[in-house]
Regions:
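Structured C-terminal subdomain patch of bacterial secreted/periplasmic proteins
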Residues: 263-327
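A short, structured surface patch at a secondary-structure boundary
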Residues: 82-130
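Alpha-helical, coiled-coil/dimerization segments enriched in small aliphatic residues
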Residues: 104, 221-249
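Proline-aspartate-enriched helix->loop->beta-strand connector
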Residues: 135-140, 157, 256, 260-264
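Bacterial Sec-exported substrate-binding components of ABC uptake systems
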Residues: 2-3, 9-13, 18, 27-84, ...
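Extracytoplasmic substrate-binding proteins
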Residues: 151-216, 306, 310-327
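Short helix-initiation/N-cap motifs at beta->coil->alpha
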Residues: 61-63, 120-129, 246-253
Length: 327
């Protein structure tokens, strides 16, 4: 129609020919679109059918075995990192309620999943009445729920998955509950492939082997992180730890000055309780004497990248990649 309206001054014959051409093209495009829609619908239906075909299934877990007759459509999660796992593999629609949802609200990467109208915030501890109100198909719990397992099981089939500092240990077990192990495996593969590729860039630019500290303001000093959750950055990318680094610890400003790392990654204080602030640090002679501060190797980060969560650590690699481009 647009093509025809722009050719009003042309001869009637040419106009008719153009209209016929447009009609034929539109028909062809419609056929292609319809074909693509049918194909996409077929793929989606096949994926859903594949997941559904894997039920009934028996899930072995920390408290024995749980039989699931059909794929769960409404899940309550009593340990918020397991909600992260479901979000990571694109299964947010099954997350009905989350104990500790407020913790995810502290981190920007989860903004799309924690807004009003999404999963219900069930508070900081598992509350039987709140869980009953949601009428879940399945409850996914963690080690701490062993003491209330019988109560939870009366509400819905319950699967207990022991927590881990390494999300790759648990994401597959969470995905197994809904028959989507393949999605979890793909997410892990994508992450590890990205980590390996980025590690190569670190080596090429000479960053590998440089000392780094990942920390967050806490009280009058800092918390730093160096355990399993940080292995992608140290063992994977090749940052070096300072001597005596623990899995987790508190460190003073003077302590940071003593180790004087090449790189500092400072997480934002999501608690709002730290007495030490970045503005105060900028006035400190000790802070300004640090190698990382003087050489522009201080980076302010969202704290989720130092956590044990799948989406947070995927974001961590994206942050590192962005930083690499600035070096």
């Amino acid at each position: 129609v647009f093509a025809a309206s722009t050719t009003k001054e042309r001869s009637f014959l040419v106009t008719v020919m153009i209209l016929l051409l447009l009609l034929l093209t539109a028909c062809g495009n419609a056929e292609k679109k319809n074909g693509a829609d049918v194909q996409n619908a077929g793929v989606n239906e096949a994926a859903n059918a594949s997941a559904g075909a894997s039920f009934p299934r028996t899930i072995k877990h920390a408290k024995g075995e749980t039989l699931l007759q059909t794929k769960p459509q409404k899940i309550v999660v009593t340990y918020f990192p397991y909600a992260d796992h479901l979000y990571a593999i694109g299964e947010e629609s099954v997350v009905s309620g989350v104990v500790g949802l407020q913790s995810l609200r502290n981190f920007p990467v989860y903004d799309a999943y924690t807004k009003e109208g999404g999963a219900k915030d069930l508070g900081s501890e598992a509350n039987i009445e709140k869980l009953l109100d949601l009428k879940p198909d399945v409850i996914i719990g963690w080690g701490e729920d062993a003491k209330i397992y019988d109560e939870l099981s009366k509400i819905a089939p319950t699967v207990l998955i022991p927590e881990s500092e390494n999300w790759q240990d648990t994401i597959g077990k969470v995905a197994e509950v809904i028959g989507e192990e393949d999605k979890a495996q793909q997410y892990v593969k994508d992450y590890n492939d990205k980590l390996l590729k980025l590690a190569g860039k670190f080596e090429q630019t000479g960053v590998k082997g440089k000392t780094a500290i990942f920390m967050m303001t806490w009280g009058k000093g800092f918390n730093y992180y160096g355990g399993v959750r940080m292995e992608p950055y140290y063992k994977g990318l090749g940052f070096a730890k300072f001597d005596g680094m623990k899995d987790w610890g508190e460190i003073s400003l003077e302590g940071v000055g003593a180790v004087d790392p090449d790189y500092i990654f400072l997480g934002k204080d999501f608690t709002g309780k730290a007495e030490m602030t970045l503005k105060e640090l900028e006035k400190s002679a000790v802070w300004n004497s640090l190698t990382a501060v003087k050489t522009g190797k201080l980076f302010i980060i969202d704290t989720e990248i130092v956590g044990p969560l799948a989406m947070g650590q995927m974001k961590g690699l994206e942050v590192m990649e962005s930083i690499m481009q600035k070096l």
